[in-house]
Regions:
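Short acidic catalytic loops
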Residues: 133-140, 241-242, 260-278, 334
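Extended, small/polar residue-biased N-terminal targeting/export presequences
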Residues: 49-109, 167-169, 173-179, 184-224
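Terminal peptide-recognition signature
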Residues: 43, 64, 68, 101, ...
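PDZ/PDZ-like domain segments forming the peptide/carboxylate-binding groove
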Residues: 92-152, 220-224, 244-251
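Extracytoplasmic/secreted cell-surface and envelope-processing proteins
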Residues: 120-121, 146-153, 179, 249-253, ...
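C-terminal, low-ordered peptide segments at domain boundaries
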Residues: 144-266, 289, 314-323, 412-430
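Gram-positive cell-envelope targeting signals
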Residues: 1-51, 61, 65, 92, ...
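Gly/Ser/Thr-rich loop/hinge elements
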Residues: 201, 208-230, 278-334, 338-341, ...
Length: 444
């Protein structure tokens, strides 16, 4: 969703009860409350000090008072109420609530099942693992009272009627269905799930027909083959390490996966960054230190940031730990158009320090034209909280560059660079035929 300065300000103003009338086409109002004015001035101060581009005063005040439609801030800038910001902080730590599913935009197709969530654990009793590419086609209080949810709107409506602690029955199908007749012909499974708080895990590893992850509930690195299908695809001298996001306990989980890789004595590792939209910069640096083959021994630069003041800051890993687990190994990367930000920065560090070449990167081609790319996000955001109110804003604060100075903002990593296109119907199919194709190509 495109967020302009006007839209961000509308959140500030509505939450703070700042003006009587705000939106476009309405005259200016002088009905300011003291607390609201303080919030607005604080917000402007953050933009002036930290936003990576200059925002003229007249553009800011026109957006605030007259409701102009200009796109003054970029799409990544966002305002949070105190409650929203607290929730965001918790989610960045991996602490979630609900059933544990995310969907592709405007669809009832699953984009992700959070590892460690109620739906993840429900896979144990399902006829097949509940994961990316399935469709949520029924929701109800019992298996006999399922309401068909063949569209996003119907699915969202039904899901929203269940709160924390409530149990719901969910029906999943392996293909999209638009009618009861199509449903009867589709492969489906129904599970019972209770909405609850959980801590998400962000790393899934597979080799030798087994899948592993660190489950926060059990506080242990364990075999989760009965919950996922990834184990069924990975055999031979290969291993797959899927990194979902750079959040929560991902850095420690990544090390657990590398230790398992060492124990399994495999020679080839596929780092799966498909649909990884990025995350925390510190976690990125902690993970990158294991993936930068020819980097300096100490404090290797993972990326650097340029701020509008002209200041440049290097963000570095503590050490080059590549040889701890990957010495003499072959590493490949899988990515797609949803691979963004920290994921692209990690790819950049791996390329610049000789861990992989562009030819070792596989990109999802959904158009069948031989061209594919990652998202192309070469800017970073920083959140700033107002200590007086608890509200916060997330603003784009800097441009980011690979160690060699390359910026992929607006471009991404592409097949034009030498990366390899792999055909797929979409960015999330069940079963994962794209992964099977990649594994076939890299099998020694």
């Amino acid at each position: 969703k495109n967020r302009t300065l006007r839209l961000v300000l509308s959140c500030v103003l509505s939450v703070a009860a700042l003006v009587a009338v705000f939106f476009a086409g309405v005259g200016a109002s002088s009905l300011f409350y003291d607390d609201g004015l303080k919030s607005l001035l604080w917000f402007k101060e953050q933009i002036d000090k930290t936003y990576y581009q200059d925002v003229p005063d007249d553009a800011f005040w026109n957006a605030a008072i007259q409701g102009v439609e200009d796109n003054v801030l970029d799409i990544y800038s966002q305002y949070y109420t105190a409650e929203e910001f607290d929730r965001t902080v918790s989610e960045n730590q991996g602490i979630m609530g609900g059933f544990g599913m995310a969907f592709f935009s405007g669809s009832n197709k699953i984009a992700r099942v959070s590892i460690g969530s109620p739906v993840f654990y429900a896979s144990k009793t399902a006829d097949f693992p509940i994961e990316t590419g399935l469709y949520l086609t029924g929701i109800g209080k019992s298996e006999g009272e399922l309401v068909s949810t063949f569209t996003y709107d119907s699915m969202a409506k039904e899901l929203s009627s269940y709160g924390a602690g409530e149990t719901v029955f969910l029906r999943f199908t392996t293909m999209p269905v638009a009618s009861e007749a199509e449903l009867s012909a589709a492969q489906s499974t129904v599970v019972s799930v209770t909405s609850a708080e959980y801590t998400e895990s962000y790393v899934l590893y597979a080799a030798d027909s087994k899948a592993w992850t660190y489950l926060e509930r059990e506080k242990v690195w364990q075999d989760v083959s009965e919950y996922v299908s990834l184990d069924e695809q990975v055999t031979g001298d290969l291993a797959v390490l899927r990194l979902v996001e750079f959040n929560g306990n991902a850095a420690a989980e990544f090390v657990y996966a590398l230790q398992q890789f060492e124990k399994d004595a495999k020679q080839t590792l596929l780092l799966d960054l498909r649909n990884d939209g990025g995350g925390n910069l510190n976690i990125l640096c902690n993970i990158a230190q294991y993936l930068m083959k020819d980097a300096p021994a100490s404090n290797p630069v993972v990326l650097y940031a340029k701020y509008k003041s002209g200041m440049q800051i290097n963000y570095s890993a503590g050490a080059n730990l590549y040889n701890s687990y990957l010495s003499g190994k072959k590493v490949y990367v899988a990515a797609n158009g949803n691979t963004a930000s920290a994921s692209e920065a990690l790819m950049g560090a791996m390329i610049d320090y000789g861990t992989v070449s562009y030819a070792d990167i596989f990109l999802t081609d959904t158009q069948g034209k031989g061209f594919a790319r990652t998202y192309g996000k070469g800017i970073m955001q920083t959140s700033y909280s107002n200590p007086s109110t608890g509200e916060a804003v997330k603003l784009t604060s800097a441009q980011i560059f690979w160690p060699n100075g390359n910026s992929i903002h607006g471009k991404g990593v592409t097949t034009d660079d030498g990366a390899v296109a792999v055909s797929a119907v979409s960015y999330g199919e069940y079963p994962d035929a794209e992964l099977t194709e990649i594994l076939n190509r890299i099998t020694p």
